[in-house]
Amino acid sequence: MHNTIYEISDKPIPKNGRATVGNLPAWFFDSVSDGACEISDDDREQEINRLAHCLGSSCTWDGKKLMLSPEIRQEYFKGAFKYFKKAASALAETEYAVFSGAVPSVAFDLALQGMAESYSDRFGAYVYDPGIEELFPLDTWIRSADVSKPYYVGGAIDYHY
């Protein structure tokens, strides 16, 4: 399976300064990805358009900058929140013996995994912030993005898992 890492900054990123696979932290390859490669300039535009489409009507991409509307969080997380609530409800009914591991339960494991993934998809898209040299799941980045300012997309990196 494949997904994309988007280099996103609140400052323009020059083409010759775009992130490469070498900028990605070791933990990412230890726990998420088994390989990655930079995306060509032609495919980069397609990937940025795919990101804008994924973010929906609460995002605009004008070819230079990405703008997020104040409604981005309300719109983007609607579907995931339904799964989160369903998993939380299932977990709320868990007996202590299952929670402690004394009684194995595949249903419990799946609900716990589903709740975590609905909050932040470990195998989804990522954002690399060159200003702080950190990598975040897209979900985490959206939760903390400042919607009052534009964002610029530098490199795009394909990763597989």
Model-derived features: positions:
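Acidic, proline/glycine-rich low-complexity IDRs
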Residues: M1, S118-Y161
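Low-complexity, serine/threonine/proline-enriched polar segments
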Residues: A26-V127
